[in-house]
From Swiss-Prot:
Name this polypeptide is given: Olfactory receptor 5B17
Primary role: Odorant receptor.
Organism from which the protein derives: Homo sapiens
Molecular function GO labels: G protein-coupled receptor activity; odorant binding; olfactory receptor activity
GO biological process, one term: G protein-coupled receptor signaling pathway
Membrane protein topology class: Multi-pass membrane protein
Cytoplasmic topological domain: 45-52, 119-137, 216-235, 291-314
Any coiled-coil regions, as ranges: none
Glycosylated position list: 3
Underlying gene: OR5B17
Domain of life from the UniProt record: Eukaryota
Subcellular location: Cell membrane
Length: 314
């Protein structure tokens, strides 16, 4: 499809224009990004190294960590560059690439969360058939499906956005190339693009959320039938971390994308975007390890092995 754009680059306004906030924000977001990389890479490595964590739940969790690294890395380095040297320009192709990878990994996380909900349903509601239900092939198909849908969704969104002509302002009132902020700059008819954004985002979010809610409804029914008092707290606690992650992710995504353009506020969008592109990827490994004895035990084993290796060297 022909692209009639006359814009070769965009200008990202960033989070703030106040000079006194540039350095504090740079330090804060650098720490957040380092914690995100360390936590998520650590989670992936831990799952790979410990055979006790080679289960469907941790397989999906490792992919969730990968998705968190993906969309955090698509956004944060450019934000840090803008804060440090005030380089707010982003090329046309870099803007498209940033939007593409954000859409890919956000969609992947969306469907991974529903896959994890189905996994918890199989573990709690059909424990005797769990190993035959969540086979390696099933897990691989679910994970591959998440990535395929992610790339398909991103391709549609990018193709729809960058077919438009940008012949007016090139100043994006955001800190990254997010579709709602970019399409406001077009001099083409944008109602179709806005409709595509809302419809596809709504389908992705609510379909995955429906699978998640149905899974947890059956989990709740099963727990209430089989356990009373303290008995049902243990199986329910295995789902607690997942429910927290679901709540944090979907609240911000719904605020960002499943609203008509007339109700968008750039300041609200920036706050929500900081939360889901930087804060949630940082919190994810913390949320999943706080009450998880398996991960804690695996971590202690790695620490003990590292200490033993150091002692043997010195």
């Amino acid at each position: 499809m022909e692209n009639n754009t006359e814009v070769s680059e965009f200008i990202l306004l960033g989070l703030t224009n106040a000079p006194e906030l540039q350095v504090p924000l740079f330090i804060m977001f650098t720490l957040i990004y380092l914690i995100t990389l360390t936590g998520n890479l650590g989670m992936i490595i831990l799952i790979l190294l410990d055979s006790h964590l080679h289960t469907p739940m941790y397989f999906f969790l490792s992919n969730l960590s990968l998705a968190g690294i993906g969309y955090s890395s698509a956004v944060t380095p450019k934000v840090l560059t803008g804060l440090l040297i005030e380089d707010k320009a982003i090329s046309y192709s870099a803007c498209a690439a940033q939007m593409f990878f954000c859409a890919v990994f956000a969609t992947v996380e969306n469907y991974l969360l529903s896959s994890m909900a189905y996994d918890r349903y199989a573990a709690v509601c059909n424990p005797l058939h769990y190993t035959t239900t969540m086979t390696t092939r099933v897990c691989a198909c679910l994970a591959i499906g998440c990535y395929v849908i992610g790339f398909l969704n991103a391709s549609i969104q990018i193709g729809d956005t960058f077919r438009l002509s940008f012949c007016m302002s090139n100043v994006i009132h955001h800190f990254f190339c997010d579709k709602p902020a970019v399409i406001t700059l077009t001099c083409s008819e944008k109602h179709i693009s806005e409709l595509i954004l809302v419809l596809i985002s709504s389908f992705n979010v609510f379909f995955a959320l429906l699978v998640t809610l149905i899974s947890y409804l059956f989990i709740l029914i099963t727990i209430l039938k089989r356990h009373t008092g303290k008995g049902y707290q243990k199986p329910l606690s295995t789902c607690g971390s997942h429910l927290i992650a679901i709540f944090l992710f979907y609240i911000t995504v719904i605020i960002m994308y499943i609203r008509p353009s007339s109700s968008h506020s750039m300041d609200t969008d920036k706050i929500a975007s900081v939360f889901y592109t930087m804060i949630i990827p940082m919190l994810s490994p913390i949320v999943y390890t706080l009450r998880n004895k398996d991960v804690k035990n695996a971590f202690m084993k790695v620490v003990e092995k590292a200490k033993y290796s150091l002692d043997s060297v010195f």
